[in-house]
Every structure is written in structure tokens, then in C-alpha cells.
Amino acid sequence: MARENSTFNSDFILLGIFNHSPTHTFLFFLVLAIFSVAFMGNSVMVLLIYLDTQLHTPMYLLLSQLSLMDLMLICTTVPKMAFNYLSGSKSISMAGCATQIFFYTSLLGSECFLLAVMAYDRYTAICHPLRYTNLMSPKICGLMTAFSWILGSTDGIIDVVATFSFSYCGSREIAHFFCDFPSLLILSCSDTSIFEKILFICCIVMIVFPVAIIIASYARVILAVIHMGSGEGRRKAFTTCSSHLLVVGMYYGAALFMYIRPTSDRSPTQDKMVSVFYTILTPMLNPLIYSLRNKEVTRAFMKILGKGKSGE
């Protein structure tokens, strides 16, 4: 029984990204610092938008959902990586691996669709200001947000079910710092070619389709801004949209590089570096990009901070 299916009878081994050399120890604590900033930044963003009623608009409600997704994303991977590094243990249970794959894939997919919804929100606000309250009513905004979560979760379920239906009869060492389904496919001794084609189609739906919506929305936005008579209105529109476009560029650039490539072209080192970028760095940068360039968020933060000081 050389090819006996050992999928469910032992743990996987996460090789991680750091060893215990002085340089890697420094990098490990740097990642923890970035994680702390990302955790605090996204938590503050969610709380600000929840507490300040003036921020209860479609744009900020969508932004709070993006921050919530980023918060969950970093908590899916970094704590386990830190525990393994500090404890010296590299194992992860089958249930733990499945949980990481589900949440990681679901959150990435949900963010893809949510970024498209955010682009549509900016399009309606700038190109159809008189109809904005109808086109982006609380009900419609809530439905599109829920749709983003559902589509992302569906992809996560598909990946978990498909990945753990394969046989893993050889090495169980995952060349990554968390369970990612492309890394598991490399270890499988089953024929994964059909699933890789399905995975490619899912990536097209999750990445290319939302990108097409974003490009179409911002093409119309740019044309509308160019024809604006007010210089102040043009500046405000570009400031609002540039923050979102910067986040979109960082997120989709890394995602396209990571998941559109064939398995045969993958390098474990490249995958680790890219994963660190959009699972830790991007969630840290998102709240900074939106808050530093947004007077309403800054005002809400100072308002809450002022209440805290006055209550002391």
C-alpha cells in the first residue's frame, strides 16, 4: 500500500519562513511589529466607523468591511507562525490546516469582490451624484457586501473540499509559513490537473472579473473628473479615488502573481515573500492609506480621542 491515502492520519509540517539566526530573529520581530500595527490600525478603523454616525455612509461602511477582512486575514496566519517559531514546533493539525485554507481563501476572495463594490460606489458617487442615495442605498450596499462574503466563502469551501480529497503519501512538509492550497497541491501524489484548471477558472472569476469592473468604473470616473468645472471638486475626487486605486494596485498585483501562474513555475521562496506582502504588509498599509488621506477619518479619530481625554 505504497500509495495509501495518509491524508487524515497525521499532521503537516510547516517549514516556516524564519530560522533562529540573528538576522531571521530580527526579521521575525519586525513581522510581529508589522502585525501589531496592522491589528491596531484595522481595529481602530472598524471602531471609528462604527462609533461615529457621520461615517455611516456606503463608502465608509465598505471601508469598515475591508478593515474587518484584513483584520481576520492577519489573524489567520501570523499567530500560528509566531507560535511555531517561539515554541520550536512546526506541526499543524489537519483541522488547523483546513481552517487556515478556508479563512485565507475566503477572505482573499471576499476582498476581491469588495474592492470591485468600492469602485462601483465611487463611480455612482461621482458620475451619478443625484441618484447616489438610490443606487447605493443601505439595502443595496448591504446586499453587495453580503454577496462579497458569500462568494469568497464559497471559494474557500471548494478549495478545502478539493484539497483534502487528494492523497498525500509522500513528504508532508509544507514549504510555507501557513497552509496554502497551492503548497499542498505540490505534495499530493494524486492527479491534480483537473483541480488546477478549476482553480484557474476560480481565479479568473475572483480576480479578472472584479478587475474588469474596477477598470470600467474608474474609466468613467476619470472622464467625469476631467470634465468637472470646479478645481476643488476635481481635487477631492482624485484624492478619494487615488487611495482606493493604490490599495487595488497592491492587492491585485500580488494576487495575480501568486495564483495565475502554473504550479510548475512556482518557487517556494517567491511564494513566501509575496504572501508576506499581501497577508501582512497590505493589511498594515490599507488603514494608513485611507486615514492619512481622509479628513473625515482623521476628524472622527480626533473626536474620539478628544472624548477620551475629556473623560480622564
Swiss-Prot record:
- Described purpose of this protein according to its UniProt entry: Odorant receptor.
Q: What is this protein called?
A: Olfactory receptor 2M3
Instruction: Provide the primary localization.
Output: membrane
Places the protein is found: Cell membrane
Listed Pfam families? 7tm_4
Highest taxon above the source species: Eukaryota
GO MF annotations for this entry? G protein-coupled receptor activity; olfactory receptor activity
Q: Which residues lie on this side of the membrane: Extracellular?
A: 1-25, 80-100, 159-195, 260-272
What the entry lists under CDD domains is as follows: 7tmA_OR2T-like (cd15421)
Give all cystine bridges in this chain.
97-189
Gene Ontology biological process: detection of chemical stimulus involved in sensory perception of smell
Q: Where is the signal peptide?
A: none
Regarding the membrane, this protein is recorded as: Multi-pass membrane protein
Query: Quick one: a GO cellular component term?
Result: plasma membrane
Q: Which organism is it from?
A: Homo sapiens (Human)
Which parts of the chain does the record assign to the membrane side Cytoplasmic? 50-57, 121-139, 220-236, 293-312
| Gene3D superfamilies given in the database record | Rhodopsin 7-helix transmembrane proteins
**Membrane spanning stretches:** 26-49, 58-79, 101-120, 140-158, 196-219, 237-259, 273-292
Tell me the keywords, alphabetical order: Cell membrane, Disulfide bond, G-protein coupled receptor, Glycoprotein, Membrane, Olfaction, Receptor, Sensory transduction, Transducer, Transmembrane, Transmembrane helix
PROSITE patterns from the UniProt entry: G_PROTEIN_RECEP_F1_1, G_PROTEIN_RECEP_F1_2
**What are the glycosylated positions?**
5
Stated family: Belongs to the G-protein coupled receptor 1 family.
